[in-house]
Each structure stands twice: as C-alpha cells, then as structure tokens.
Amino acid sequence: MKSNKLPSHHGRQQKIKGKYPNQTIKLLVERASLRNFSDKKIPPRILQYILKAGIHAPTGGNLQPYSIIKVEKTKIKRKLAKLCWQKFIGDAPINLLFCIDWHRLERWAKLEVAPFTATSSFRHFWISFQDTLIGAQNICTAADSLGLGSVYIGTSLEFIPQLRKMFKLPRGVFPVVLLCLGYAKKPPLPRKKLGVDVIVHNEKYQELSDTKLLNAFNGKYPGLKVAINQDRLKRIEKVCRDVAGEKFARKCLARIKKNGYISPVQYYFGLHYVANLMPTDNEKFLKLMEKFGFNWFKKYSPYKGKK
C-alpha cells in the first residue's frame, strides 16, 4: 500500500509467534528498540546489575578499552535530545555514552614505565571498537532481562566535538554510541528481519540468485511502497546524478515511474540515508580522530632518537 507519508526507516513491525527453548532466546528474538519511555525511574540496584553485566562483556586481552558516561541529570539529557534530534532522549531516565578509552590504559603504562602505541595502531582501534559495542549490547540484553528497554542513538556521531566538550573527554577517549535506557509506556513490537537462510552462509560466502534476494527483501518490507511526488523525484534524481551520473539518474526515475512507487531501497539510499551525502565527511572524521589523539590512519615511524 502506497502512503504519502514517509514510512519509518526502522522497517515493519511484527508479532512473533513461536516456541522457545528458554526465556533468554525469547528475549533476544523479540528484542525491539524502545522510543516511548515512561516516567518510572530505574532503581539503583537494578542499574548496578545492568552496568555490571556490561563491564563483564568479553574484550580483547581483557583490557576493557572503553568507558561509559552515565547521564541522569535532566538538563544534560534535554541538551542531548536537542543535539541529536531525538526528543525521547530527554525522556529516558538514563543515557549511557560508550567511548573507546585508551587514555586510562596509557596512564597505566606511563605509571608502570611500559611501552604504549595503542592510539597509533589500527589493530588496537579495530578491537577496541568491537569491545565497546559488545559491552553496549551486553547492557541492552541485561536491561531487557530486567523488564527495561533500550535504543541506540546513531545521530550522536554527528556531534562528536560537542560531546567531547560536554563530557570533558580527554585525548585517547572517543565517543562511539549513545544508549537510552528505561521502562516502556507501551512495549514495542520487534521489526521484521532477513532470515537465517539469508544472513548465515555455510562454510563460504554464498550468492543468492536475484530472485531469492529480491524475495528476501520483499518479505522484510512487505507492501512498503512510498508514494511518488515531485519533491521526492527531484531529490532522488539529484542523489542519483551526484553518485553515478545523468544516465543512472534517468534509469532510476524510469524504474520508479514504471513501478508506480518508490521502493524501500530507493527510499533508504535516495531519501533517507542519502547516498550522495553519507561519504562526504570521511576526512572530517579522520581529523576528529586525530584531535582526540588517534593516529592509526597514519604511517607509524619507530623511535629514531638516542638509544
């Protein structure tokens, strides 16, 4: 069904029916992002359980190269909500900012007179990024298990300098993701997903046929057809032209007019996560990393001073 209103970019909701071997599997399969928080506060004891679950997540070498900034003050939460364009951030009783943190480990190395190059190493950056997100997801799961909900805030990426100033982040500490925690006014329904048969590959990468691939995405976004209007056509045309030239822009518009609607993938990369803007700030982000004390993208030169 076509709608003049732009659909949620989070996809279709669904009620999941089925039997589970235990409550943990049920919780994981039916997990959904929460954006309507109630006024109920999180009891300190419950919050401690949740945070403890986070810090016990696996990390490379058990180094725990991340820190979590806990935000409870209403004034700061509202400032975050305005900054990240998400009103519900101000409604959530707790916001957690997850940061890669090599500052703490570098201080430890200096105090114990140990060599340290982690902020200049892509290997360390890559593992610490994974570690930070694994810790965040542990906290999400712990929160769900205790009757709370959560939602990740991707737009925090756009305001890294402001976050650094707000939370007094030292060099070697880089914000990765913001997470809101709280109780639901109304429990959210989970979103439809691609199936195990699409995401999991046996022994090696296996290309689906075009038909199977299209069927898989049609199953994930059933009936999602965005209505055509001149503004949307104009916007998509510009994105296509910027990304792949005039010929591709004409081809995309012809497909839209032939179908009689804008498809989900045309909506995602033509109107929402617009493909001509998403790569534009790559250099800016690298410069930001350098300001935060990270140099893993530069050639490393070993010490050449006096031995």
Region annotations inferred by a language model:
Residues 1-307:
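Acidic, surface-exposed loops and disordered segments
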